[in-house]
Amino acid sequence: MQETQRLAVELPGLSLKNPIIAASGTCGYGQEAAKKYNLNHLGSLVLKSTTLYPRQGNPRPRVCETSAGWLNANGLQNVGITAATNEKIPWLRKNYPQLPIIASAAGFSEDEYVKVVSEFANTAGVKAIELNVSCPNVKHGGMAMGTDPEVLQRLVKQVVKAALGIPIYVKLTPNVTNIVPLAQAAEQGGANGLTMINTLTGLSIDLKTRRPALANVTGGLSGPAIKPLALRMIHQVRQVSSLPIIGVGGIESAEDVLEFMMAGANAVQIGAASFHDPLACPKIAADLPIVMDRYGIKKLTDLWEVRF
């Protein structure tokens, strides 16, 4: 079997050469990551979460390292939907015409989400849209819409209409008692897939200043610390939903990728690993067939049948 066949993954709107997707917020709009490596090594990438208008983000410092990951409170800093659709995405299409683009829509009201999704849906090259309803470090909006199943279902219904057939993947927050009702709400609202999980709200304190390490006080925890939680939540949701799941949370190796797919994910995103190694995504993609051979895995999609 050819390597391309072993690694290929088909999801709604996305034909991926491999399951490795650069997570939103780790590669900007592609131009930043392209300075480090050839983006064609990826299955896909998710653009920076984009709002209706440009945002400067939260005060600095916004990022700090923890013992098992990172805390970030960027506050949805982005160029706004007009610049994203008129400048950023055309650059990606011109330089990487074969790379499937996943846009990421964020907002502070249902109306804003609908407008952003509508603009992305009318932009050539966008193959899928990730709905970021789980950002833990902005006030008013963001995660607030992703913690109430009824509100989430209503929002998803509206953005699915605005998407004009472009698949919608809802990025779920782990900052809830039970993530399953949120997954079910997204599915009932018409979502084509789920991305899980986003970061967990955390706090780090600077002993010298006796103040929080982040100006925003709290931030989103990512990295190896959240991997077991992500695996558990993906497994929980897979028991009740057949929607495609893109797993994310602490993945740092090809072995981690296989764990996520055995837990119920159909593809994965690499996030925090790219902070300490900008080449994490292409390295993991290159390692996958080697590790698959080690564990006797002929093709990745065989792991979709794993159940426990």
From Swiss-Prot:
Enzyme class, one word? oxidoreductase
Q: Return the cofactor note field.
A: Binds 1 FMN per subunit.
InterPro entries annotated for this entry? Aldolase_TIM, DHO_dehydrogenase, DHOD_1B, Dihydroorotate_DH_1, Dihydroorotate_DH_1_2, Dihydroorotate_DH_cat, Dihydroorotate_DH_CS, Dihydroorotate_DH_I
A Gene Ontology molecular function term for this protein is: dihydroorotate dehydrogenase (fumarate) activity
Q: What is its EC number?
A: 1.3.98.1
Co-factor requirement: FMN
Q: What is this protein called?
A: Dihydroorotate dehydrogenase A (fumarate)
Report the source organism.
Limosilactobacillus reuteri (strain DSM 20016) (Lactobacillus reuteri)
